[in-house]
UniProtKB/Swiss-Prot annotation:
Cofactor(s) essential for the protein: Mg(2+); Zn(2+)
Region (Disordered) residue spans: 183-209
Binding site residues for Zn(2+) 1: 60, 62, 75, 78
Binding positions for Zn(2+) 2 per the UniProt entry: 890, 967, 974, 977
Record GO biological process: DNA-templated transcription
InterPro entries: DNA-dir_RpoC_beta_prime (IPR045867), DNA-dir_RpoC_beta_prime_bact (IPR012754), RNA_pol_asu (IPR000722), RNA_pol_N (IPR006592), RNA_pol_Rpb1_1 (IPR007080), RNA_pol_Rpb1_3 (IPR007066), RNA_pol_Rpb1_3_sf (IPR042102), RNA_pol_Rpb1_4 (IPR007083)
Protein name as annotated: DNA-directed RNA polymerase subunit beta'
Subunit (UniProt): The RNAP catalytic core consists of 2 alpha, 1 beta, 1 beta' and 1 omega subunit. When a sigma factor is associated with the core the holoenzyme is formed, which can initiate transcription.
Source taxonomy: Bacteria, Bacillati, Actinomycetota, Actinomycetes, Mycobacteriales
Length: 1317
């Protein structure tokens, strides 16, 4: 077998009959499989041992040779080679066909490759192949031309003879008629008798004429057909063909079935055809040119590569190894077999029957019928159901053919090559483990013992607890006490991987150090739940064990959960306190007026109280019950850094540890600040979730990851501790209904009644009534909410939970205690009947019914969304899987401009709200210079929060940053253009698979995006706004948007004309060019609102000035139009902006760079318009890099470069158009991709990840990249010196570790003795 790590590319091509025979180890001649009595394979059958190898190791069929010592001998009795049985997985056989057959992929695929090659319509091809028509394969033009006059004379003679015969017959008949009439005349017969006789005679004469005419016409048809006879001409009429064959058989050759196709291909001159097609493309027009282009693609493929088109017609069919199509005995003596065996048997049966018929010399019609059946059986074997009715097995189930084994989710590619099962793994339910550190997980003892079994057994033998592995295994199975001690030792420092399905992003698998726990559930650290999207309501997780030292190192360094605190999508921490922890910290840092031990200033006779000399003293007071954690106190602090403003005021030279200052705060806040790293400024605020998030963000920017991990761990512990102390619980008594509710509802009820009356009287139409009612009840709900808010006490547990940001929101509180309000129907419109009850009071039957309406829609939506979002992720991964960081810097000068802030009219700067996802974590492309010309931040610097603050302070509003959109690296991207890796906070490493990270970052929040298209309700018939997931798909698939808005092709003034249904907009260009007219723009799409020069916003009106690319109506611009009008850079920025709008609407933060990676892949290709002196075909798609390289080469040689136009491809199309045929085939349309790749003899350079996973190589990303693969360890000087010192002769000198290791034991029979001879 080939070692996969030693080849660089994989080529696919057409196999010729000779190739098939070379692969084969023998011909399969019989359809038999296994002898049902002996259960041994039949000789020459589909499982024959002579062809495919022995069924048992080192044993021939007849049993003459048994044992490994006869290795390689071929038994003279049964002809079976003595070898391992596993050769039955790799040895192929073949079936010699009695008549050639065509390969269905090439004739039936769309477009038909055979049809394009031979220039035959698929319908005609089908007629020829399935014996419904003859085709002329060759014509001897010269011979026909030379002898045409002779043949014509012969034909004239034949015609003359027929005409003479006719004339003579007519003459004779006329005379007979005359004689008959005369006789009747003499007898004095009646006139009607005479008439009958005359009519009869005339009818016969007419028949004579017609018969002769038919014969003459037939001769004429034969003659004209013969004179115009040309190769590839179809003759459907069998009699005509026979006649031609009899008369002019020596001048032409014709046939039907695959044999005729084979002859046509043999006679086909590829070079001449390619030349003539190129000529047609240069000079032709319209349909003719288009067809020539399509045909040239196929013809040129055979012209340039080593493939012969003869491979599309088969003389032999390969038989795959029997172990790949096994036959298994079930209990009860029956057999289960792979469908392929049935399909092969049909082929063999028909083939054998055809051979017999040919030997017998059966009539042609019978032989042809059998050949047609053979063709159909081979078609079914290759691709069942592609043509006609599929071959079915028992129960009318279509049999799975070779193509079906590759296709789809259950096919070879996706089931076995891209998704494999792994050993050393287990799964169990998860429970929370609040006592764990961030990098730990609790592993149940039993599971750990099973996972680490081999390690434990080896260690037991090493420690002499067991004599050999077998007894060690027995000890483990009986769970002896020593086993647990050894397990503790083995498990130490050996990380395990935990994974929760669905793994939507890379944080779905993380490494932890296992801690043994009792019970059978895995314990999970509460802070990693966010990343795994896990909760403890019965979720399960899988455990995997990294075995090799390299795998363990990677798990520990790259995948340990404490090294994965930041989200790869936004670069912000994911391991944040949530739920209980937030509540606990919120409780701890709340300040309550008048609480026990509060600070009171000195009065006349009272000294001041609530002043403490140190936190320790305050804690003593707390322990004695003289102070509450939430009371305001004054305390002298020396170990905590003062806030920035106090530090600036009190310590102008900077604060040092031990400098004292007094804080007016609560003990709780002091305790909270003690959890933060030393030197972090004191935070004197109430900690709701937003503030906690901001602090952890800040920590992640300023401190090393290890400090952040320790801090969040401390916050977790404190959060749980104080949440327990706070006593926050929820009971029915905490749900308070506002007393004013009834009065509010009665007031609005009256308003609603008056609207209803107006509707009854016909003053309002239905839509207006609905709109008015919706408005009334929305106001009512709002007012009940206000009443609720003012009615609740501050310390109410529900309010505490909501205000702290732990979970829930005010709407939910209002639903519980106030009123539910209006709900929507499945269309997304409001039902104008409100739900007036709260859940505390209980809903009426009608209210409950209305409420279920919306709830059920929600559940159905979620299910659909999950599937859609998963498919979107799959397409994104496929399009971007080969984007890997390949070099440090591509040295480009280019970049994109991002806005940092907007200048207001008064000159102040307002920070751009999207700075987090646009400028943050990028590399500067040029120096950022302020108004005076001072460089604030240098080129090549990373923009973190401090750098952005410095730029804003210097008054800089926009900067030019590096971007993957402008990166100059050929395949993949360079580290500088990509910028900081969001997950590590440092410049991205070479080998990082940024494409996959981008796809996951966009796909993972996909489930949160809403499905529905929103309706702008109301009377004015607004267009649908497509939002959520459908909009993201529409953008990435580069589809024309549903409500497409025209964009201005040129800059200029507009003339707006309105009719009752349409707008007509004319743009008068500034440069005086031709006017651009947009006609028939529907008035349902409103005019676009524009920001005008004076800063006001209003609708587009007559006489306004528009810039090129500006949208004229509401709706979405068509990205293809943007590309045409404004070019590739603008369309990329447009797509990024539009995708971000959808995600931002849902409150999801994703960095622009991820979307840019995908968009870059959508614009990788160029359509060739004019090929110049290059090899490209006009109309074909080419990689931009390849296009530019070829053009440089041609220009250097003084030739004409090719002209191309950038194309925007949707992600599905771009995935299928990738250079890697393995990746494309495993994605979608497997047979089409493979057909195309085989014809073009495609070579896969194995540059992406998928291709390498499929063939089992290490992926070229991360530590699998080439530069990291051959690292050698060089000893340091000290180590070298130590190696030459004289060893001391102590006990360990004789230990087995001494000296050169002898390596693993080698089985004797594999050992080569050649060196010793």
């Amino acid at each position: 077998m080939l070692d996969v790590n030693f080849f660089d590319e994989l080529r696919i091509g057409l196999a010729t009959a000779d190739d098939i025979r070379n692969w084969s180890f023998g011909e399969v001649k019989k359809p038999e499989t296994i002898n049902y009595r002996t259960l041994k394979p039949e000789k020459d059958g589909l499982f024959c041992e002579k062809i495919f190898g022995p069924t048992r190791d080192w044993e021939c069929y007849c049993g003459k040779y048994k044992r490994v010592r006869f290795k390689g001998i071929i038994c003279e009795r049964c002809g079976v080679e003595v070898t391992r049985a596993k050769v039955r997985r790799e040895r192929m056989g073949h079936i010699e066909l009695a008549a050639p057959v065509t390969h269905i992929w090439y004739f039936k695929g769309v477009p038909s490759r055979l049809g394009y090659l031979l220039d035959l319509a698929p319908k005609d091809l089908e007629k020829i192949i399935y014996f419904a028509a003859y085709v002329i394969t060759a014509v001897d033009d010269e011979m026909r031309h030379n002898e045409l006059s002779t043949l014509e004379a012969e034909m004239a003679v034949e015609r003359k003879a027929i005409e003479d015969q006719r004339d003579a017959d007519l003459e004779a008949r006329a005379q007979k008629l005359e004689a008959d009439m005369k006789e009747l005349e003499d007898e004095g017969a009646k006139s009607d008798v005479k008439r009958k006789v005359r009519d009869g005679g005339e009818r016969e004469m007419r028949q004579l004429r017609d018969r002769a005419q038919r014969e003459l016409d037939r001769l004429e048809e034969i003659w004209t057909t013969f004179t115009k006879l040309a190769p590839k001409q179809l003759i459907v009429d069998e009699l005509l063909y026979r006649e031609l064959q009899d008369r002019y058989g020596e001048y032409f050759e014709g046939a039907m079935g695959a044999e005729s196709i084979k002859k046509l291909i043999e006679n086909f001159d590829i070079d001449a055809e390619a030349e003539s097609l190129r000529d047609t493309i240069k000079n032709g027009k319209g349909q003719k040119k288009l067809r020539a282009l399509k045909r040239l693609k196929v013809v040129a493929a055979f012209q340039t590569n080593r493939n012969s088109p003869m491979g599309m017609v088969l003389d032999a069919v390969p038989v795959i190894p029997p172990e790949l199509r096994p036959m298994v005995q079930l209990d009860g003596g029956r057999f289960a077999t792979s469908d392929l065996n049935d399909l092969y048997r049909r082929v063999i049966n028909r083939n054998n029957r055809l051979k017999r018929l040919i030997d017998l010399g059966a009539p042609e019609i019978i032989v042809n019928n059998e050949k047609r059946m053979l063709q159909e059986s081979v078609d079914a074997l290759f691709d069942n159901g592609r043509r006609g009715r599929p071959v079915t097995g028992p129960g009318n189930r279509p049999l799975k053919s070779l193509s079906d084994l590759l296709k789809g989710k259950q096919g070879r590619f996706r089931q076995n090559l891209l998704g494999k099962r792994v050993d050393y793994s287990g799964r169990s339910v998860i429970v929370v483990g609040p006592q764990l550190k961030l990098h730990q997980c609790g592993l149940p003892k039993l599971m750990a013992l099973e996972l680490f079994k081999p390690f434990v057994m080896k260690r037991l033998v090493d420690l002499n607890h067991a004599q050999n592995i077998k007894s060690a295994k027995r000890m483990v199975e009986r769970q002896r006490p020593q086993v647990w001690d050894v397990l503790e030792e083995v498990i130490a420092e050996h990380p395990v991987l935990l994974n929760r399905a669905p793994t939507l992003h890379r944080l779905g698998i993380q490494a932890f150090e296992p801690q043994l726990v009792e019970g059978k559930a895995i314990q999970l650290h509460p802070l990693v739940c966010e990343a795994f999207n896990a909760d403890f309501d019965g979720d399960q997780m899988a455990v995997h064990l990294p075995l090799s030292a390299e795998a363990q190192a990677e798990a520990r360094i790259l995948m340990l959960s404490s090294n994965n605190i930041l989200s790869p999508a936004s670069g912000r921490p994911l391991a944040m306190p949530r739920l209980d922890m937030v509540t606990g910290l919120y409780f701890l840092t709340t300040e309550i007026e008048g609480d026990t031990g509060e600070f009171t200033p000195a009065a006349k006779d009272q000294p001041e109280s609530g002043v403490y000399s140190s936190p320790a003293e305050a804690i003593m007071a707390l322990d004695r019950g003289a102070l509450s954690v939430r009371a305001k106190i004054r305390v002298r602090l020396t170990q905590l850094r003062p806030p920035a403003e106090i530090e600036a005021e009190r310590f102008p030279d900077g604060w040092n540890m031990g400098d004292a200052w007094t804080a007016e705060t609560t003990l709780g806040r002091v305790l909270f600040n003690e959890l933060l790293p030393r030197g972090y400024p004191f935070v004197n605020k109430q900690m709701h979730k937003k503030v906690q998030a901001a602090i952890i963000n800040d920590l992640a920017e300023r401190y090393p990851m290890i400090v952040v991990a320790q801090t969040v761990d401390k916050l977790k512990d404190a959060g749980f501790y104080w949440a327990t102390r706070s006593g926050v619980t929820v009971s029915m008594a905490d749900v308070l209904v506002p007393p004013e509710k009834q009065e509010i509802l009665e007031r609005y009820e009256a308003e609603a009644d008056s609207i209803e009356k107006q509707y009854q009287r016909g003053k309002l139409n239905k839509d207006e009534r609905n709109e008015a009612l919706v408005k009334i009840w929305q106001d009512a709900t709002e007012e009940v909410g206000q009443a609720l808010r003012s009615h609740y006490p501050k310390d109410n547990p529900i309010i505490t939970i909501v205000d702290s940001g732990a979970t829930g929101n005010f709407t939910q509180t209002r639903t519980l205690a106030g009123m539910k309000g209006l709900v929507t129907n499945p269309k997304g419109e409001f039902i104008p009947r409100p739900i007036k009850s709260s859940f505390r009071e209980g809903l009426t039957v009608l209210e409950y019914f209305i409420n279920t309406h919306g709830a059920r829609k929600g559940l159905a939506d979620t299910a659909l969304r999950t599937a859609d979002s998963g498919y979107l992720t799959r397409r994104l991964v496929d399009v971007s899987q080969d984007v890997i960081v390949r070099e440090t810097d591509c040295e480009t000068e280019r970049g994109i401009t991002v806005t940092l802030a907007e200048k207001q009219a008064d000159g102040t700067l307002v920070r751009d709200q999207h700075i987090e996802t646009s400028a943050y974590a990028r590399t500067l492309a040029t120096d950022a210079v302020d108004a005076k010309g001072n460089v604030i931040v240098e080129r090549g610097h990373d923009l973190g929060d401090p750098a952005i603050d410095a730029l804003l302070a210097a008054g800089i509003t926009e900067v030019k940053v590096r971007s993957v959109l402008t990166c100059g690296t050929g395949t993949g991207v360079c580290a500088m253009c990509y910028g900081r890796s969001m997950a590590t906070g440092k410049l991205v490493d070479i080998g990082e698979a940024v494409g996959i990270v981008a796809a996951q970052s966009i796909g993972e929040p996909g489930t949160q995006l809403t499905m529905r298209t929103f309706h702008q309700g109301g009377v004015t018939g607004g267009a649908d706004i497509v939002g959520g997931l459908p909009r993201v798909q529409e953008l990435f698939e580069a589809r024309i948007p549903r409500n497409r808005a025209p964009i201005a092709d040129v800059s200029g003034r507009i003339r707006l004309e309105e009719s009752d249904k349409f707008y007509k907009i004319t743009i008068v260009p500034d440069d005086g060019g031709e006017e651009v007219v947009y006609d028939k723009l529907s008035r349902r799409q409103r005019l676009k609102v524009f920001k005008h020069d004076d800063g006001s916003e209003r609708l587009l009106t007559d006489g306004d000035h528009v810039e090129v690319g500006q949208q004229l109506l509401e709706g979405s611009a068509d990205p293809h139009e943007v590309l045409r009008v404004q070019g590739p850079r603008e369309v990329q920025i447009h797509l990024v902006k539009e995708v971000q709008e959808v995600y931002r609407a849902q409150g999801v933060s994703i960095h622009d760079k991820h979307i840019e990676v995908i968009v870059r892949q959508m614009l990788r290709r160029v359509t060739i318009i004019d090929s110049g002196a290059t090899e490209f075909l006009p109309g074909s798609l080419t990689e931009r890099g390849e296009f530019e390289t070829e053009n440089r080469r041609v220009v250097a040689e003084g030739g004409e470069p090719a002209a191309g136009r950038p194309v925007l491809m949707g992600i599905t199309k771009a995935s299928l158009a990738t250079d890697s045929w393995l990746s494309a085939a495993s994605f979608q349309e497997t047979t089409r991709v493979l057909t195309d790749a085989a014809i073009n003899c495609r070579s896969d350079k194995l540059q992406g990840l998928k291709e390498n996973v499929i063939i089992g190589k290490l992926i070229p990303a991360g530590t699998g990249i080439n530069r990291y693969r051959n690292i050698q360890v060089q000893p340091t000087e000290e180590a070298r010196a130590a190696a030459y010192t004289i060893p001391s002769y102590e006990d360990q000198y004789y230990s087995p570790d001494f000296g050169q290791a002898t390596g693993a034991a080698v089985p004797l029979d594999d050992y080569g003795y050649s060196d010793y001879r």
